[in-house]
């Protein structure tokens, strides 16, 4: 299944046959960082802080720890065969064509749903400056812009993600530095609140809402990490993947400590967790509370670009998944055609049209944070399915191809054990989703996607995949 599309570095290669390795190490490192700093951190952390209090720091650390091992499994598998274009390829190769079909289409749907959440977030951030702006205007403008830029070249996507990620990095580092200065100077907000690390343990302790509050923080916190596997969809367009992919994956723990743990510690030191408004981004509200409205506008711009960055990643990855699925015969043939610039243009256009569903979602559920919660729950469940498929593929790889593991230059630590630990953790998170009313609704809707996929495989996909193999 993995040798049907040639992947080349030569910019002069025939566009109809090949993707091009035009993403450099600089692009891959920043794409990985940008993927780890998702909309969920900016948009969802207000709700998670209000649900869990300071214990949300441990929630992010636990999820990050688990996903690091998922990414290590993905990295070893992708590097075991450089013909793999993405994780749907090794799922198809190791688990069977059905797995490639389910993984590819589910990952496509994951990013469409995530893109809808980004559209919702962009609308909310735009209303910070333009409260009377129609929802659909901001959404449509962003979608058209992303489509136009992605139709250019894969290098354009890499450049956009590079600068989007740089904006996020500078903003979060600045927030941490400013917050530390406020704490050191015992800064007082207009409401009389003094910045202090003591807010982390003085207002009810580390677990003010008990274990129930701690567990409740996992759902939106999981969504903050979606996109962490994005480097796995760039494998076919990366120069020197043997060096770039390990470097990007190995930096995950540092990124989590810097961008999640430190940022949340500073936010809750300047603004007591009990004062955080669930419906608003604490990154914006932090500066509003300390009387710096101009800085709040800057941060609002940053979180808006973060949402645009996430949507940009979604547009890229969905088009590449559709391209691979079409090559395997389980998606319309039109998606397998590349433009003169080696870009899957029809897949890009189709995915962007689907993003307009975010606008529809706002009409169905006028509450922005309510719509965001419902969308993110569906997305989190589907991403956990994809991560589980990666782990299952790794277990089969270890059993059926031990010789490849032995000579691997990038072995997953504690491979088999951590696969089972991570899968048990995902089951635990799904159980937690049944405890809250808003997340339970989305959990009940999600199986409809798998039923639709199953019917598609039974009546169409299975036959087409068999014909292509012959």
From Swiss-Prot:
Taken from the record's topology, the Cytoplasmic segments are: 1-29, 72-101, 158-161, 232-255, 304-349, 392-412, 462-470
Q: Where in the cell is it found?
A: Cell inner membrane
> Null phenotype?
Mutant exhibits increased resistance to D-cycloserine when grown in a minimal medium, but no change in D-cycloserine sensitivity compared to its parental strain when grown in a complex medium.
**Which Pfam families does the protein's record reference?**
AA_permease
Means of activity regulation: Beta-alanine uptake is inhibited by carbonyl cyanide m-chlorophenylhydrazone (CCCP), which dissipates the proton motive force.
Q: Which PROSITE patterns match?
A: AMINO_ACID_PERMEASE_1
Q: Which residues lie on this side of the membrane: Periplasmic?
A: 123-136, 183-210, 277-282, 434-440
Q: How does it sit in the membrane?
A: Multi-pass membrane protein
Where do the TM regions start and end?
A: 30-50, 51-71, 102-122, 137-157, 162-182, 211-231, 256-276, 283-303, 350-370, 371-391, 413-433, 441-461
Q: Which domain of life is it from?
A: Bacteria
GO terms for cellular component:
plasma membrane
Gene Ontology biological-process entries: beta-alanine transport; D-alanine transmembrane transport; D-serine transmembrane transport; glycine transport; L-alanine transport
The molecular function terms in GO held by this entry are:
beta-alanine transmembrane transporter activity; D-alanine transmembrane transporter activity; D-serine transmembrane transporter activity; glycine transmembrane transporter activity; L-alanine transmembrane transporter activity; symporter activity
Q: What induces it?
A: In complex media, expression is negatively regulated by Hfq and the small non-translated RNA GcvB. Hfq is required for the GcvB effect.
NCBIfam families registered for this protein in UniProt: PRK11049.1
Annotated family: Belongs to the amino acid-polyamine-organocation (APC) superfamily. Amino acid transporter (AAT) (TC 2.A.3.1) family.
Q: What is this protein called?
A: D-serine/D-alanine/glycine transporter
Q: Which organism is it from?
A: Escherichia coli (strain K12)
């Amino acid at each position: 299944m993995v040798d049907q599309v040639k992947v080349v570095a030569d910019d002069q290669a025939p566009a109809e046959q090949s993707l091009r390795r035009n993403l450099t190490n600089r692009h891959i490192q920043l794409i990985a960082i940008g993927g780890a700093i998702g909309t969920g951190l900016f948009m969802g952390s207000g709700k998670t802080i209000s649900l869990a209090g300071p214990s949300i720091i441990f929630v992010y650390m636990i999820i990050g720890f688990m996903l690091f091992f998922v990414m290590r499994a993905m990295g070893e598998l992708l590097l075991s065969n450089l013909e793999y274009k993405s994780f749907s390829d090794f799922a198809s190769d190791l688990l069977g064509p059905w797995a490639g079909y389910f993984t590819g289409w589910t990952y496509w749907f994951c990013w469409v749903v995530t893109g809808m959440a980004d559209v919702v977030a962009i609308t909310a951030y735009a209303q910070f400056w333009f409260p009377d702006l129609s929802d659909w205007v901001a959404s449509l403008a962003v979608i058209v812009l992303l489509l136009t830029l992605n139709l250019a070249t894969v290098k354009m996507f890499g450049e956009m993600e590079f600068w989007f990620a740089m904006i996020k990095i500078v903003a979060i580092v600045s927030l941490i530095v400013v917050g530390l200065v406020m704490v050191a100077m015992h800064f007082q907000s207009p409401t009389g609140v003094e910045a202090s690390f003591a807010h982390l343990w003085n207002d009810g302790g580390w677990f003010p809402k008990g274990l129930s509050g701690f567990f409740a923080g996992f759902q939106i916190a999981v969504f903050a990490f979606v996109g962490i596997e994005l480097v796995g969809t760039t494998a076919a367009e990366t120069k020197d993947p043997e060096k770039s992919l390990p470097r990007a994956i190995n930096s995950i723990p540092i990124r989590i400590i810097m961008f999640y743990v430190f940022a949340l510690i500073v936010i809750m030191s300047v603004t007591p967790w009990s004062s955080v408004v669930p419906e608003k981004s604490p990154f914006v509200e932090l500066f509003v509370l300390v009387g710096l409205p101009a800085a709040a506008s800057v941060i609002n711009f940053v979180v808006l670009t973060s949402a645009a960055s996430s949507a940009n990643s979604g547009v890229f990855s969905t088009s590449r998944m559709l391209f691979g699925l079409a090559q395997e015969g389980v998606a319309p043939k039109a998606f397998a055609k590349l433009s003169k610039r080696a870009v899957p243009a029809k897949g890009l256009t189709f995915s962007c049209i689907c993003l307009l569903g975010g606008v529809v979602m706002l009409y169905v559920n006028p509450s922005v944070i309510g719509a965001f919660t419902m969308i993110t729950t569906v997305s989190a469940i589907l991403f956990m399915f994809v991560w589980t498929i990666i782990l299952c593929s790794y277990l089969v790889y270890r059993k059926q191809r031990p010789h490849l593991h032995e000579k691997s230059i990038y072995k997953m630590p504690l491979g088999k054990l951590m696969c089972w630990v991570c899968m048990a953790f995902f089951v635990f998170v799904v159980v937690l989703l049944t405890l809250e009313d808003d997340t339970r609704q989305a959990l009940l809707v999600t199986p409809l996607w798998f039923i639709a996929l199953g019917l598609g495989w039974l009546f169409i996909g299975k036959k087409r995949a068999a014909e292509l193999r012959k």
